[in-house]
Each structure stands twice: as structure tokens, then as C-alpha cells.
């Protein structure tokens, strides 16, 4: 839930106007909109490069994943791994645009650790894949944008650990 919606819901539940603090938070959210959209455009427009570079780095650091018996062994399974990376990058983009981790949590992280464990997927490798995407993506951004985007990558990584 965005800060705008959350503030309105809270104020309405108490039958009151928005407080000065709530208005300040909404103003900050609106003011940061341009940078959040710029970050989302960078992530979206560079997604193929981010996924490919991060995938290459992951497979170099974790050769066990693409070796016989590994979860990304073979063309089909490697493609599945890259598809999952794309999925997490998309979720991160949603969070950036919303200015909140709620879309990430509600759309994609509920029960993810348990699902990966049941499939025999090494969760630490998934977390490493997100770390690699963070490194590539934030390397394409200014310091402030990288810090903003990095927080959403870190949220996903934390959910995997």
C-alpha cells in the first residue's frame, strides 16, 4: 500500500483530516516520483543486459548450479533460472515505482523460500542471483538512484536468506 493510500486509510479510519506529518510524507513521496520513475525506466530498459550479466556472474561464481546435477544444468533449466531472475527484477521495479516493498511482498515473496526448498533449489543461489543483478543494475545509476534501487534488491535478498 502506497504512503498516500495508507495515510488516507488511517485518517479515514479515525474520521480525521490528514495530519501535517502525513502530508509531509505524501509530499516527499510525490517529490521522489521522478527519481523512482527514472530508476524503473533504467531497470526496465536494461533488463536483458542486467539479467545476462548477472546470470553470467552467478554461473561463474556458482558453477555447481550449471554443472550436471545442478538446478540450472542444461539449456532449459538455465533458461528457467534466468526467467526467475527476470521475475525478481520485475518485482523490484514494482517496489521502486510504488516507493514501498508491499508489491514485492504480496506478489512474489510469500512462501518463496519454502517453494524453492520443496523444489530442491538452493535458495542461497537465488539470493546470489539477486545480488548479482543489484551489482549490475546499480552500476548503471547515479549514487542516489543506486541507493534507492539497492534497498529493494536488499529486501528481496533478505527474504531469501
UniProtKB/Swiss-Prot annotation:
CDD domains recorded: APC_alpha (cd12125)
Membrane topology: Peripheral membrane protein
Subcellular location(s) per record: Cellular thylakoid membrane
PTM comment, free text: Contains one covalently linked phycocyanobilin chromophore. The chromophore on position 81 is added by the phycocyanobilin lyase CpcUS.
Coiled-coil region: none
Keyword Electron transport: yes
Binding site for (2R,3E)-phycocyanobilin: 81
Key words of the record: Antenna complex, Bile pigment, Chromophore, Electron transport, Membrane, Photosynthesis, Phycobilisome, Thylakoid, Transport
GO cellular component: phycobilisome; plasma membrane-derived thylakoid membrane
Keyword Plastid annotated: no
Pfam family, one: Phycobilisome
Gene Ontology BP, a term: photosynthesis
Classification via InterPro entries: Globin-like_sf, Phycobilisome_asu/bsu, Phycobilisome_asu/bsu_sf
Function: Light-harvesting photosynthetic bile pigment-protein from the phycobiliprotein complex. Allophycocyanin has a maximum absorption at approximately 650 nanometers.
Assembly description: Heterodimer of an alpha and a beta chain.
The family this protein is said to belong to: Belongs to the phycobiliprotein family.
Record protein name field: Allophycocyanin alpha subunit
Protein's organism: Picosynechococcus sp. (strain ATCC 27264 / PCC 7002 / PR-6) (Agmenellum quadruplicatum)
Gene that specifies this protein: apcA
Amino acid at each position: 500500500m502506497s504512503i498516500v493510500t495508507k495515510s488516507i486509510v488511517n485518517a479515514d479510519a479515525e474520521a480525521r483530516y490528514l495530519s501535517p506529518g502525513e502530508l509531509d510524507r505524501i509530499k516527499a513521496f510525490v517529490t521522489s516520483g521522478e527519481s523512482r520513475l527514472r530508476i524503473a525506466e533504467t531497470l526496465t530498459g536494461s533488463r536483458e543486459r542486467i539479467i545476462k550479466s548477472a546470470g553470467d556472474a552467478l554461473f561463474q561464481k556458482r558453477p555447481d548450479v550449471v554443472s550436471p546435477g545442478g538446478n540450472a544444468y542444461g539449456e532449459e533449466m538455465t533458461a528457467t533460472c534466468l526467467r526467475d531472475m527476470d521475475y525478481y527484477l520485475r518485482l523490484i521495479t514494482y517496489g521502486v515505482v510504488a516507493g514501498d516493498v508491499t508489491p514485492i511482498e504480496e506478489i512474489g515473496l510469500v512462501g518463496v523460500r519454502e517453494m524453492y526448498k520443496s523444489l530442491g533449489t538452493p535458495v542461497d543461489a537465488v539470493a546470489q542471483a539477486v545480488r548479482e543483478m543489484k551489482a549490475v543494475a546499480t552500476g548503471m545509476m547515479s549514487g542516489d538512484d543506486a541507493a534507492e534501487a539497492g534497498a529493494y534488491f536488499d529486501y528481496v535478498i533478505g527474504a531469501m536468506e
